[in-house]
Curated annotation (Swiss-Prot):
This is Pyrrolidone-carboxylate peptidase. It comes from Thermococcus onnurineus (strain NA1). Keywords: Cytoplasm, Hydrolase, Protease, Thiol protease. It holds the Pfam family Peptidase_C15. Its main location: cytoplasm. The gene is pcp. Its EC number is 3.4.19.3.
Amino acid sequence: MKVLITGFEPFGGEEINPSWEAVRRLPDEIAGAELIKRQLPVTFRGVRELLPRLIVETKPDLVILTGQAGGRPNITVERVAINVMDSTMPDNEGYTPEDEPIFEGAPDAYFATLPIKAIVKALREAKIPAAVSNTAGTYVCNTAMYTVLHTIAVAGMETKAGFIHVPFIHEQALDKPRPSMALETVVKAYEVIIKTSLKA
C-alpha cells in the first residue's frame, strides 16, 4: 500500500506551515504502508499542475492532503470540495481569482472518499480535538482537494482521498490570540488518520 501525504509551504506572512512541519516528521512507513511525503506550493496554478502528475507517477492507494486553517481550534476533516477558486487574499504568486472554476465543465463538487466520521471518532478517542468540516473554503486548499478527487474520478482509479485542516501550532500563536495545537499532537493526528483510513 502507498500513501501520498502532502502539506503546504508557508503563506499569508507565516514563516512556517504546520501542515508540512507535521508531514515531514512522519516515519517513512505506517501500518505496513509506504508514505510518500510532498510539499505543495500555495498557488492555484501550482497545485493544479503538480497534483495530477504526482498521482499518475506515484499511483497511491490513499491520498491525504493537509493544510493550515489558522483560527480553527481543532483538526477538521473536510467533507466536500467545490469547483470554485475565489479569494481576496493573494496566493504565493500574487493571484486573486474571483468566482473562477478550477476545471471548466467539471462537476460542481466532489465528496471526500476518506472515512471522515471514523477519522473524527478515532482522533477523539486519541484525545485529539477533531470535527467534520463542511467547507474547505475557496482558497488553495479547496483547489488541491478538488484537483485530486477530480483526477482520481477521471482516471477511474479506486484511490481514496480527502483533506485535513490543522490549526496554528503554538509558536505561530505567540503574538496573536488564535487557537493553537502542539506540533507533536498534529503529527500524532496524522498517524491516527492514516491508520484509520487504511483500515476502512
